Amino acid sequence: MMRTLLAERDSERQRVEELRKRADELYLENLRLQVELARYKKWTYGPRADRLSENELAQVLLDFAEELEQLPIPSEEVPPASEPEYELRRVRRRKGRRALANFENLPVSTHVYELSAEERACPCCGVERQEIGTEESWQIEYIPGHFERIRHVRKKYACPSCERAGENPRIEVAAKADTAIEKGFAGPGLLAYIVTSKFADYLPLYRLEDIFERQGFEISRATQSVWCGDVADVVEPLYQRMAERVRQSHVVATDDTVLPMLSVGHTQPARIWVYVGDQENPYNVFDFTLDRGREGPKHFLRDFTQTLLADAYGGYNGVVTGNAITRAGCWSHARRKFVDAEKTAPEIAREAVSLLGKLFAVEKQAKEASVEERLQLRQRQSVPLLAELRQKLLRWKEQLLPKHPMAEAVNYTLSQWAELNVFCSDGAVPIDNNVSEREMKRVVLNRKNSLFVGNPRGGRTAAILATLTSTCRRHEIDPQLYLTQLLVNLPSWPARDLDAWLPDQWKRAHAARCAALGIPAPPTT
């Protein structure tokens, strides 16, 4: 009897221990879900003062997009979610009216208003009144774009003397300028408009189709897509030159995201990558791959031997291993993990975010400094902060359960510690990877409107044309103006002088031409 009772007791103790273990697992899972829910709510409904910064929001968008891309597209519209509760906020005072001097670069059309002969007669004596001055007022007007048919007439010439003698009249036809699309009817301005609308303004081609139809001209989205591919073929030598220049950078920042590609019966999660060059090689170059394997960045970064600034994606290990590449980490990623887990360990989160805030404050102070001055400032101020943070990370790691959400933030930071500290030994390395993440956010916006690419050629086209429009944005260049001139000239441009069409060099040359003519440079962006 006693033996049976002891066996039952041991069995109950074992069951209690199993239940306790299960309760701990559920507790940690509950904390994780609370973190995710708080993250989504803050992203969606957070008050303006508490919402994520632009760079943090970009990272959240990328994380969400990769999860959402795997979900099926619903056949019916999803009912809108219930509106959040509103709270009183300080009303922002509207900015004053912009001075007309800000619009001096616009062309001027003058409308003159005069009195008729009858109105000029003086009502008192009937004598004609003389003009004594004017009153002026200004308006900013929008003149909708329009299509024109451009007729190219090539005159033919023949030798009348040879023709009279019965010989070959030696006919010569005047040369016509090369076109971006051989035997195509789309002019360079129209092609530039389509590329700018899709890759700089994120308009899907079906919307452009509707816009063109309202203006009295039908261009199907299929035709536009073919034209975009043709433009990419024309500018690919320039794209390759920009990629070559990026690989010459001292620091290359990179990031990637999903770019769905149509496949048989489903969409395939292909990838688009961005590689941001430094100030000496100021180009944002995109690349398209069929998957997220390391072969993509490894191929693009061939011959690169400097510093690669990236997130913690393990595929980059294969890029730097065996190569003379230094890998740098992103402190914005680390900070975001502490912010996400704030609800589960608020004291730790506040302490970590406070220290990281001081770290970023040093960067703000060093923003306009030279590379040498920035490095000295980091050595004086950032290194002690990092030493203090590391001590606290090790202490928190001992305090937290391994699966605690805050432990994930602590372990992530410690595992990336060497990469996260590279910026303290090189003043040219940024503290975060926000510059490439901002470019990925724009890819996400374009993907939201266009959903997918049709095939590998479409992905390659997207990468090439996004490279041009993104680099134009970086240099505050009007992509419509730049692309129009590029497509007019590049087909017949000598390959040895290709650098003249790099966006930064084109901008300087364009400004110099305008100055030589004594006219203001056209607006950039």
What does each model-found stretch correspond to?
Residues 1-185, 253-254, 498-502, 516-525:
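Short, flexible loop/hinge motifs at secondary-structure junctions
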Residues 131-133, 167-171, 261-263, 283-286, ...:
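Short helix/loop capping segments that flank catalytic or ligand/cofactor-binding pockets
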Residues 251, 312, 321-354:
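Conserved beta-strand -> loop -> alpha-helix junction used to position metal-binding or nucleic-acid-contacting
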Residues 103-104, 114-119, 123, 205-303, ...:
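Gly/Pro-rich turn-and-neighbor structural signature
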Residues 187-201:
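Short, amphipathic alpha-helical "recognition" segments used to contact nucleic acids or chromatin
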Residues 303-305, 313-315, 351-525:
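Acidic/histidine-rich catalytic cores and adjacent linkers
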Residues 129-131, 139, 202-203, 232-234, ...:
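Flexible loop/turn segments at secondary-structure boundaries
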Residues 46, 122, 159, 194, ...:
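Mobile genetic element proteins and their domesticated derivatives, centered on retroelements
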